[in-house]
């Protein structure tokens, strides 16, 4: 399922272990190369990313949660270290405070078919339009 176009943008979710790379680091650095993805399905998602698409940054450890939003600033492309892999550049947009926890997402009852719930090991995935709309209602302070 490709990222859902909503107002011309597509939306994705990318997971990270905050001990490896956190939203705080992305905010400080302003931009990063998103790499380290190995799963074939997640690599396909990275390759589909285009400049202007939005990516929800999800901390996968501790209390799992969507913690921020980034914008894709370069298209998905082969990883220069390993052409079988793919990378994309992300630019920090905003933090989501309070973070949207996995418990909160599950409790909404709206996203049982989303890969975030069904395929918990998948590191990068499209975000459904319903999630984007729900998040805009739940956290209106973060504009994306």
Regions found by a protein language model. Name each.
Residues 1-51, 139-144:
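Compositionally biased, charged N-terminal/linker segments
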Residues 10, 30, 51-53, 66-68, ...:
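A generic structural signal for short beta-strands and their flanking turns/coil linkers
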Residues 14, 51-55, 122-124:
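Hydrophobic/aromatic beta-strand segments within beta-rich folds
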Residues 19-21, 97, 132-134:
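Short, acidic Gly/Pro/Ser/Thr-rich loop/turn segments
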Residues 56-57, 71:
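Hydrophobic beta-strand signal
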Residues 58-64:
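Short, charged beta-turn/beta-strand-edge "cap" motif at the junction between a beta-strand
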Residues 66-125, 129:
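Aromatic- and Lys/Arg-enriched surface recognition patch
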Residues 127-144:
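Charged phosphate-binding loop/patch that engages nucleotide di/tri-phosphates or the phosphate backbone
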